[in-house]
Structures are given as structure tokens and as C-alpha cells.
Design a protein with these regions (language model features):
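Glycine-rich phosphate-binding loops of nucleotide-dependent enzymes
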Residues: 2-262
């Protein structure tokens, strides 16, 4: 493994009872890549995300972060090593403010004792000030600073999507996993999101692995695409290669490329 490999999955398989959800999956993420993971519903995409983040443990194979096996790691330990994610179904702290949601995302970098918090020590105040400053900076990037004190539940749906990405970036990840970030967004919101993903990748020097059904977004921003069908990888390559791959069109789309937006 070379030094710039952030995450690697080797021959990863997971079974639930008699069902093989993912079979012999391989993945290597380097540097500041922007990689798409696509396939029909039930292909195993979110299951892969759950394995990469420690929610599920592979039945076979191995996942490494920075060369270190994740077999014994808890999800929070994987986050601490630089992997953050969003979810297909938005998971915000709806009763907290927009600002507090982002601050929570970065809490692993602002550790202080419970006693320090109770006594309001200088260390506590300094950590809180840094957390707020960084959180406000992220909200500025995602156009949410003016809503910092609003409750997360009161944001429009598209803003909640952006807030979830901002919260994930607060963890200062080396690799950001986005699970259907454009789900439920209209065309204008999707195009704006594409710009923000690119901007975030460049500004924070973070690699991005995203699951998405919106082919315009995937083909427009991903440098490499992996295609799954029934838990198996059926193709991998650049967008133009995937767009022209008849196996992908048949297995994933089941319709002519033009009709599918490819």
C-alpha cells in the first residue's frame, strides 16, 4: 500500500444469515479523489458505507484506514481517524440550533473534562470559542450563517441537507462519505450542491466518496465511478467509460443511455 492511500477495502464480503449483501468488494481511495458509488436500490451501497464506518463488520475481507485495520475499531474511533459521513435519511439534532449541530460535529477536536465545563475554566472557554468560530466558518461556506440560531427542524429540506454536510466537515475528515446528498433536491439545489462539494473538496483537501442516484451529479463531479449490482462490482472507471458501458446500462439502468441521462 502506498503512503497516500486513505482507505482500502480488500475482498470484503458481508452476509446477513443466508443473504450475501456485498461480495468480494475492493476499494482504494487516495489523496483528494472524488469517487462515485452507484447502483440500483438494494445493490449494497449503504451497506458498504456502514462497513467503512464500523457500523457493520465484514464477514470476510479487511478494511484499512491509513494502513491500520479497522476490525477492532468502534465507529467513533474510525471518525477520529478521519472518516466522516452523512446519511440517506437526514439525521440532524432537530431541536438544537444550526450552529450547535455543526459544533457537535467537531467535538472530538475540542476535548475538555466535565469538571472544566462545570467550572468554566479557561480551557473550556477557549475550546468553545474555537468550536464556534470553525462552525460559523462552515455555515458561511454553505450559505447558512444567517440561520445559525434557528432550530435545525425549521430549516427547509435543502438547507438541512447542506447542514448535514457542514456538520460532517466539522470533524475535519480526510475522507467524507456522502450518502445520496442530492436526494429530494430540485435541479437548482442539486447544481448548487455540486459546486459546494467541489469547493469543500478543494478547500479542505478532503477525499469524497458519494452514493447518488442523480446521474447528472455523479457524471458531473466524480473522477472515478464504481458500479454495483446485487452486491458485486460490475464496472469501474471514468465517467465517460461508465456512460458507454453496456453492462452498466443494462444491469443498473435497464434502459437506453439517452433515456437514463447518461
Amino acid at each position: 500500500m502506498t503512503d497516500n492511500v486513505l482507505l482500502e477495502a480488500k475482498n470484503v464480503t458481508i452476509r446477513f444469515g443466508g443473504l450475501t449483501a456485498v461480495s468480494n468488494f475492493n476499494l482504494s481511495i487516495r489523496g483528494h479523489e472524488l469517487v462515485g458509488l452507484i447502483g440500483p436500490n438494494g445493490a449494497g451501497k449503504t451497506t458498504i458505507f456502514n462497513m467503512l464506518t464500523g457500523v457493520y463488520k465484514p464477514t470476510e475481507g479487511e478494511i484499512r484506514i491509513g494502513g491500520e485495520p479497522t476490525t477492532e475499531m468502534k465507529p467513533y474511533q474510525i471518525t477520529a481517524r478521519g472518516v466522516a459521513r452523512t446519511f440517506q435519511n437526514i439525521r440532524l439534532f432537530k431541536e438544537l440550533t444550526v450552529l450547535d449541530n455543526v459544533k457537535i460535529g467537531g467535538h472530538i477536536h475540542y476535548q475538555y473534562s466535565g469538571l472544566a465545563a462545570v467550572l468554566h475554566t479557561n480551557r473550556f472557554y477557549e475550546a468553545e470559542q474555537r468550536a464556534e468560530s470553525e462552525a460559523l466558518g462552515l455555515l458561511e461556506i454553505f450559505g447558512l450563517r444567517s440561520r445559525a440560531n434557528a432550530l435545525a427542524k425549521n430549516l427547509p429540506y435543502g438547507d438541512q441537507r447542506r447542514l448535514e454536510i457542514a456538520r460532517a466537515l466539522a470533524a475535519r475528515p480526510k475522507l467524507l462519505l456522502l450518502d445520496e446528498p442530492a436526494a429530494g433536491l430540485n435541479t437548482g439545489e442539486t447544481l448548487a450542491l455540486m459546486d459546494k462539494i467541489h469547493e469543500s473538496r478543494d478547500k479542505f483537501q478532503v477525499a469524497v466518496l458519494l452514493i447518488e442516484h442523480n446521474m447528472e451529479l455523479v457524471m458531473g463531479i466524480c473522477e472515478r465511478i464504481i458500479v454495483l449490482s446485487f452486491g458485486k462490482t460490475i464496472a469501474e472507471g471514468r465517467p465517460e467509460q461508465i456512460r458507454a458501458n453496456p453492462t452498466v446500462i443494462e444491469a443498473y439502468l435497464g434502459e437506453p443511455a439517452e433515456a437514463a441521462g447518461l
